[in-house]
Amino acid sequence: KSINQYDSEVRKGNFKKNASIIETLELFKKEVLIVGFGRIGKCLIKRCLGFEMKVKVYDPFVSNDVISQFGGNKIENLNDGLKSCDYLSLHIPLTEKTKNMIDSSKLNSMKKSAIIINTSRGGIINEIDLNNALNEKVIFGAGLDVFEQEPINNDNPLLKNNKVILSPHSATFTNECKSRMSIE
């Protein structure tokens, strides 16, 4: 919902009930592509189904039966999934095969309204290509919790891009998560 832009406008005193100047997208009945179907991918699918999203999963190591048990549809070809998804959520390890997996060619194959979320590992998305894609309106937006260089370099152009929401690799920063981790 472009929360970062709304927040910025309200702080500037631009409180408008009809803020139609800021583009927003919703989750309801949209298509999400989950790349990587481990513990986090399985947790995410439950939330997506709550919004009646069409869920596609790309994970060459997980069977179609397992994915269908969770309510998803397995796809065999990442490129096919990228072309149709409204949201792309990455949940894979960084390896030689996954480094820069999402580059300019993959970004250019996506919908202009697509949003990418990466909470797995930095380096899976080519950050320069992502920044260019956002600036050129190749895709709509991104949410990143991980970066190729952590902490993120001060000269990283993503820091100045208002089409991306950034957080500091902070999945475990909630009080509830810290509590669970202390007993597991």
Predicted regions and their residues:
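Phosphate-binding beta-alpha-beta segment of Rossmann-like dinucleotide-binding domains, i.e.
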Residues: 1-31, 43
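Short, flexible hinge/linker loops that cap or flank conserved catalytic cores
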Residues: 25-28, 49, 108-109, 158
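Glycine-rich Rossmann-fold phosphate-binding loop(s) that bind the pyrophosphate
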Residues: 37-38
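Conserved S-adenosyl-L-methionine
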Residues: 50-54, 136
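Rossmann-like adenosine-cofactor binding region
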Residues: 62-157
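Short FAD-binding loop at a beta-strand-to-alpha-helix junction that anchors the flavin cofactor
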Residues: 157-174
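A conserved FAD-binding loop/helix module that cradles the flavin
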Residues: 170-184
